[in-house]
Swiss-Prot record:
Gene3D superfamilies: Aldolase class I. Substrate binds at N7, F8, K9, G164, S200. GO terms for cellular component: cytosol. It comes from the Bacteria. The gene is tpiA. Involved in the gluconeogenesis. Catalyzes stereospecifically the conversion of dihydroxyacetone phosphate (DHAP) to D-glyceraldehyde-3-phosphate (G3P). Belongs to the triosephosphate isomerase family. HAMAP family: TIM_B (MF_00147_B). The active site is at H91, E158. It is found in: Cytoplasm. Keywords: Cytoplasm, Gluconeogenesis, Glycolysis, Isomerase. Pathway: Carbohydrate biosynthesis; gluconeogenesis; Carbohydrate degradation; glycolysis; D-glyceraldehyde 3-phosphate from glycerone phosphate: step 1/1. This is Triosephosphate isomerase.
Length: 238
C-alpha cells in the first residue's frame, strides 16, 4: 500500500480544490490511498466530493483542546462533527510556533479521537550537518510510543532543510532515516508503522523515490498544487 498525501498548506481556493478533485487520475484503492489536506476552512465544503472521489481529507493543525475559549482553533470534536476523521499533526511549519510538549498533546488527543493521524517529523539543517538527524527525530517521537491508538498513526519524515527547496535529495540519508525510524518504532511498539517521505517531492525525483523500498508513500507540498504533476506522481507509484 502506498500513501500519497497532498498538503495544500495555505494555498487553496475553492476553485483549486474542485479542479484537483475532479481531475485526479484513476487509481487502485487496494494499492494506493490518496489524501488531501486542503486547509481546514474548506474541509466541510468538499467532504462529499472527496468521498465520491475516494480521497481522504485531513485537517492541518488540530487543537490540543476539545472545546473552550480558544479563539481561532479547531478541535478534533469539531472535525468529527463535519465528518473529518484524519489530521496532519506536527508539521515543521507548525512546530516553529509550538513546543514539543504542545505538539505531543496535539498528537495524543488526535490519536484518541480521530481515525488516522499523520505525525510529521524532521531534523534541522544543523542537526543534519552534525550527523545528529536520527537522534533529533527520535526525540520528536519519544512520547508517542506510550499513547493509545498507535495503529492509527503514520509518520511523515520531512527533513526541514529539504522542504520547498531545489536541493538534490540525499537518498542514502533518506533510507538511513526511514530505516532508523521504522526500527525504533517497531522495537518499541511491535507495530510496523508506515513511514512517508516529504521534502520537495516532485515529478522530477519521484522515479528515484519510488525505487526506495523502505518508503511507504509521500507527503507532497508545492507539487500537489498542480493536479497534472500530482497525477504523474500517482502514475509512478502504481
Amino acid at each position: 500500500m502506498k500513501y500519497i498525501i497532498a498538503n495544500f498548506k495555505m494555498n487553496a481556493t475553492q476553485e483549486l480544490i474542485n479542479h484537483f478533485l475532479n481531475n485526479l487520475t484513476l487509481f487502485d484503492e487496494q494499492k494506493i490511498i490518496i489524501g488531501l489536506a486542503p486547509g481546514d476552512l474548506y474541509l466541510k465544503t468538499f467532504v462529499n466530493l472527496a468521498e465520491i472521489k475516494k480521497v481522504n481529507l485531513y485537517a492541518q493543525n488540530p487543537s490540543l483542546h476539545n472545546k473552550g475559549p480558544y479563539t481561532g482553533q479547531i478541535s478534533c470534536l469539531q472535525l468529527l462533527d463535519i465528518n473529518i476523521k484524519n489530521a496532519l499533526v506536527g508539521h515543521s511549519e507548525i512546530r516553529i510556533d509550538f513546543s514539543q510538549s504542545i505538539i505531543d498533546q496535539k498528537i495524543k488527543i488526535s490519536m484518541d479521537l480521530l481515525e488516522q493521524v499523520i505525525i510529521c517529523v524532521g531534523e534541522t539543517f544543523d542537526a543534519y550537518k552534525q550527523n545528529k538527524s536520527l537522534n533529533f527525530v527520535l526525540n520528536q517521537l519519544a512520547n508517542i510510543i506510550n499513547y493509545k491508538g498507535l495503529k492509527k498513526i503514520i509518520i511523515a519524515y520531512e527533513p526541514i532543510w529539504a522542504i520547498g527547496t531545489d536541493l538534490e535529495l540525499d537518498f542514502k540519508h533518506i533510507n538511513y532515516m526511514i530505516e532508523g525510524i521504522k526500527t525504533y518504532l517497531y522495537n518499541c511498539t511491535g507495530i510496523n508503522i508506515p513511514i512517508l517521505y516529504g521534502g520537495s517531492v516532485n515529478d522530477n525525483n519521484i522515479n528515484e523515490l519510488c525505487n526506495q523500498k523502505l518508503i511507504d508513500g509521500f507527503l507532497i507540498g508545492n507539487a500537489s498544487l498542480d493536479v497534472n504533476v500530482f497525477n504523474k506522481i500517482i502514475d509512478k507509484c502504481k
